[in-house]
């Protein structure tokens, strides 16, 4: 049995602690311990990037975005976790 205080619960958006690339898959370790991965080919700009360019991913905005400076590409971590991709799977 749960007891409700009547106070709204604040939703916590997923945030990244770190990000890395293996081959053409980008992995993100989230603050809650989960690790999610997605193929670079699900985003237009990343699909055209080299593996070396993909490997230069940075975690930005307190963990709420991934940034590829050289590619001028930003992807939100909550969007990744929710499965919001630009392109369908191949």
Mark where each language-model region is:
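Motif-centric detector for short Cys/His coordination patterns
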Residues: 1-90
């Amino acid at each position: 049995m749960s007891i409700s205080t009547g106070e709204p619960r604040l939703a916590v958006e997923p945030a990244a602690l770190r990000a890395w690339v293996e081959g053409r898959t980008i992995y993100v370790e989230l603050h809650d311990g989960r690790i999610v991965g997605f193929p670079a080919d699900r985003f237009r700009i990343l699909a055209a990037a080299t593996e070396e360019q993909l490997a230069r991913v940075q975690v930005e905005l307190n963990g709420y975005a991934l940034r590829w400076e050289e590619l001028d590409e930003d992807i939100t971590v909550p969007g990744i976790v929710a499965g919001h991709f630009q392109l369908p799977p191949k």
